[in-house]
Amino acid sequence: MHYREKSLGELAIAIPRATALFREFNLDFCCGGKQTLQHAAGKRQLDIAMLEARLAELDAEPPSEKNWRAAPLNDMIPYIVQRFHDRHREQLPELIIMAEKVERVHQDKSACPHGLAAQLTLILDDLSQHMMKEERILFPMIQAGMGRQAAGPISVMEHEHDDAGQQLEVVKTLTDNLTPPADACNTWRALYAGIGEFITDLMEHIHLENNLLFPRALRGEA
């Protein structure tokens, strides 16, 4: 199979563990999921043959996760809310507290991530509004069998997902791609590790909605 001609979103759906590979090489499979593997690899000057070989290995493994391509949407939506929405609401306030501490205590150090707490607060505010709109408007429409009529709200949600992806790039820039200095304290290291976990969760969250839930809802699946 020539994986290079497939989009990152298609590959992430067909080979669930491919998402970890894409994160390893900083390939955006959620907001940038429509670009082909070849295009994405070319932008980052990655070895396309190596990526295809890794994908072939993953493709040969038996699936270990729930098949969201076939599961009822009424199962997928509660999973998204419990696994991702509720988790983000826990993650971000704690990360903001730690970021404020690191910026205050280490403000004179060159590697101090000045502005990180403010950026995380912006993400929390925007994401909170976004998730509320999904839970109060879009998800009830889909659960009521009105997915075909939800093109407008889905378009808005996808645009906001793109905005979230851009906000994550700001976080990566402020933190030197989540790389703490050699002499970083435990709070600093825990902060960057926690942000890394949040980014992983958010990318999985957006992937599940953009590449699976929304297309299936628009096709009128239940």
From Swiss-Prot:
Predominant localisation class: cytoplasm
Source species: Musicola paradisiaca (strain Ech703)
Disulfide bonds, paired cysteine numbers: none
Gene Ontology molecular-function annotations: metal ion binding
Function, in words: Di-iron-containing protein involved in the repair of iron-sulfur clusters damaged by oxidative and nitrosative stress conditions.
GO cellular component: cytoplasm
UniProt xrefs under Pfam families: Hemerythrin, ScdA_N
Gene3D superfamilies: nmb1532 protein domain like
Keywords: Cytoplasm, Iron, Metal-binding, Stress response
Encoding gene (name): ytfE
Protein name per Swiss-Prot or TrEMBL: Iron-sulfur cluster repair protein YtfE
Keyword Cytoplasm: yes
